[in-house]
Structures are given as structure tokens and as C-alpha cells.
A protein has these predicted regions:
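A conserved beta-strand-loop-helix scaffold within acyl/acetyltransferase catalytic domains
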Residues: 1-35, 97
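Short, contiguous acidic/charged loop-to-helix segments that flank catalytic cores in large enzymes
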Residues: 30-38, 67-73
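Active-site/acyl-donor-binding loops of N-acyltransferases
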Residues: 54-99
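Generic hydrophobic alpha-helical scaffold/packing signal
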Residues: 13-14, 48, 79
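Short amphipathic alpha-helical segments, especially helix-boundary/capping motifs
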Residues: 21-25, 42, 55-59
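Conserved acetyl-CoA-binding loop-helix of GNAT-fold acetyltransferases
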Residues: 35-51
Length: 99
């Protein structure tokens, strides 16, 4: 999904279908020069619309945390932003592999 303003790409979202019921909005990117146009909000809305049209029940809009070393801290403003779309917070384990 790409967002345009005056024929210029100003944002995009990448969705992956993860199973028959859900997909994940894996990346929701914007060009910060155009942040006042709220393309991130539009991209979430369009992703929700697309998921519903394709028979999916859930759209995972990703994690909402900051990392300070090994410490994980909730990113309150991002959580609030996502809750405006009706999102419900869930805790999920994150696995990492040290190479």
C-alpha cells in the first residue's frame, strides 16, 4: 500500500497474511516531511479495509515498545495512537538469536 501526495510517495504499509484469519501490518512508514498529512493513520485505515474485504478477522498492527538495552518499555504515545483504531494491547514473546 502506498500513499501519495502531489504524485510523490509519502508513505507506505506492508501487510503479510499470516493465516486464514489474520494479517500483520509489518511496516507502516511515512516521510516525516509530510507527517501533518497523517498518512500513517490513512494507511492503517486502508489496511483494515483491505483485511476486511479479504475475509480476514484480525489486523495485527505490530509492537509498541522501546528498547533500552535488555529492558523493554511500553511506548505510550504509540499505544494510544493504535487504540484510536480500536486496537487492544496484547503481550507477545519476542525471540532473538544472537549471531
Amino acid at each position: 500500500l502506498l500513499s501519495y501526495y502531489e504524485n510523490q510517495i509519502i508513505g507506505g504499509a506492508l501487510n503479510f497474511i499470516t493465516n486464514q484469519n489474520s494479517c500483520i501490518l509489518f511496516y507502516n512508514m511515512i516521510d516525516y516531511k509530510y507527517k501533518d498529512l497523517q498518512s500513517a493513520s490513512l494507511q492503517i485505515y486502508k489496511s483494515l479495509e483491505w483485511a476486511k474485504q479479504n475475509g480476514l478477522r484480525y489486523l495485527d498492527i505490530g509492537v509498541s515498545q522501546l528498547y533500552e538495552g535488555e529492558k523493554i518499555i511500553p511506548h505510550d504515545s504509540l499505544i494510544n495512537f493504535k487504540e484510536q483504531f480500536g486496537a487492544k494491547a496484547m503481550i507477545r514473546k519476542v525471540m532473538k538469536l544472537k549471531l
